Amino acid sequence: MRIFLAGATGAIGRRVALLLRQAGHDVTGTTRTADKSPRLRELGVTPAVVDVFDADALAEAVAVARPEIVIHQLTDLTSAPGTPGYPAAQEANRRIRIEGTRNLMRAAQRAGTRRAIAQSIAFIYPPGEIMRTEDDPLDLAAEGVRQWTVQGIIELEQRVLTTAGIDGIVLRYGYFYGPDTWYDQPPKSPSVHVDAAAHAAVIAVSTGGGVYNVAEDCEIVSSARAKRELGFDPAFRMSR
């Protein structure tokens, strides 16, 4: 299938790109800077150098790719939690989730895309030591920096799930850990290895619909739906 992968050079995007190519898909992947294009070509991915905030340029790139599937792995987190730059990074990430998602979904709709898969987060539910499922409300009472995160996620998910003519899938990932992430081991619950997260996105190309928690087994978030409907395997690891 023809797939447009937005955010193809990030920690999860690179893994998604590789798995898609191994499965035989025709992949166009975005990067904001031309110097990352060779990395995509090495994977067999057609680079699209584009700024997702440039709606016209993004629409043209998607139109050229003519994708049946769009995968949204766009983030803009340049600073880790607890660092001085984290609040600014969260604001940048909120913008990409709102404006970037809007531009991407409009471009996908115009190009005749039939399915969209988007990265969300599983640590978006209200705090508390109870098991959360996809049917539980999000943390609408959040304050401060977390409020920005919740706002961005709500807009992203609604846009992906309600764009006319497109079957939307939202993957609510746990905290990433593994190579190319901030953490070598699970930092806290809910967590998910970056390889297993990428694999879930690839599975969703051909099955499933709606919202899925994608995390390792823990006491606060259930991924039973993703295991049952997608075949999500938290133990999946890519060969090195």
For the regions a protein language model found, what residue spans apply to each?
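N-terminal Rossmann NAD(P)H-binding glycine-rich loop of SDR-like oxidoreductase domains
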Residues: 3-25
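Conserved glycine-rich Rossmann-like NAD(P)H-binding loop of the short-chain dehydrogenase/reductase
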Residues: 25-32
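Conserved SDR Rossmann-fold cofactor-binding beta-strand/turn motif
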Residues: 31, 172-173, 202
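NAD(P)H-binding glycine-rich loop region in Rossmannoid oxidoreductase-like domains
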Residues: 32-99
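C-terminal amphipathic/interface module of NAD(P)-dependent oxidoreductases
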Residues: 46, 50, 55, 220-240
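Conserved Rossmann-fold NAD(P)-dependent oxidoreductase catalytic core, especially the SDR/UDP-sugar
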Residues: 81-144
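Conserved beta-loop-beta element that borders a ligand/cofactor-binding pocket
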Residues: 115, 119-123, 155-179
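Alpha-helical substrate-binding/gating segment
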Residues: 176-180, 187-212, 216-217
